[in-house]
């Protein structure tokens, strides 16, 4: 399966919205102004939300308010040269994100040979 990562939805055609598998969010609702579903509660009924913050920091209030529909995960802060022992955990986080995306896709009817008719 091939994935296409895009920075924004400005160039989206209507049929693209049925192929969205995840939305990375900063927690600011203005980022959804050009989306088919402007309201985060509605958006995350149709697709998985993902927030990546710093390990040990609490996610912003907006993200916590969106509940279980947004995966909130954290990476270690960069501590400078010679302190990169924690970088191996980045791979764990990336694998966790991909697992969540794939699990969500299966739950919504995605298969290797076809996408669901509608999200």
Labelled PLM ranges:
Residues 1-119:
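Extended amphipathic alpha-helical regions
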């Amino acid at each position: 399966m091939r994935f296409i990562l895009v920075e924004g939805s400005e160039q989206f055609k209507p049929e693209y919205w049925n192929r969205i598998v995840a939305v990375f969010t900063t927690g600011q609702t203005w980022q959804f102004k050009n989306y088919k579903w402007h309201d985060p509660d509605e958006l995350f009924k149709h697709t998985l939300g993902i927030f990546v913050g710093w390990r040990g920091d609490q996610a912003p209030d907006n993200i916590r308010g969106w509940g279980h529909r947004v995966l909130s995960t954290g990476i270690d802060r960069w501590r400078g040269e010679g302190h990169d022992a924690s970088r191996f955990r980045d791979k764990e986080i990336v694998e966790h994100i991909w697992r969540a995306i794939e699990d969500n896709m299966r739950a919504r009817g995605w298969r290797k040979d076809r996408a669901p008719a509608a999200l």
